[in-house]
């Protein structure tokens, strides 16, 4: 929206399009509307960007994946950066981002050890999720480390006098965003320390669902 407000060339395009429409030749004719139902000449796919044909669907997925890899390669090359920092939760989004990062490093002839992957367990992190994160990082051969964010989260919750610190089981949005914010803060400070870029793990599905909390994990990634 801000880009549209700053850029004023869109009005020029509208005017040009209007003039082009005026120059089109118009041919009038009469057409009798049939009373019977008209069958469609071709089936219209319910999900046009996700083909029913498995081979075509795989082709589309590979293309989208290569766009991600190429975009990361371009950013690393442009900024002359050889390391990335990424938070790995054990879920699907961060797993996909981590795999894309490994392929970008391979194509740039950089060691996968330059991917600094961190799992940052919080109050609700399960052993299964944490183990999945460790197994994935080990399988991909990246530099991995675990940082428990609970102490720093607890300090912030105490600072803001959140009822959780008094023993009340209040798991509200403040409780959740303290953890998201701590994770993001850790990752950016680690990137500063190691002269790296933070690789976001958010995706368009999160954006479509409204998961873009300002200032913390979703918005920053």
Please give the residue ranges for each predicted region.
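C-terminal, active-site-flanking charged/polar segments
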Residues: 1-6, 138-143, 218-221
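Short glycine/threonine-rich loop-to-helix capping motif typified by GTGT followed
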Residues: 89-101, 128-131, 160-162, 213-216
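Generic beta-strand/beta-sheet core signal
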Residues: 79, 86-89, 95, 118-121, ...
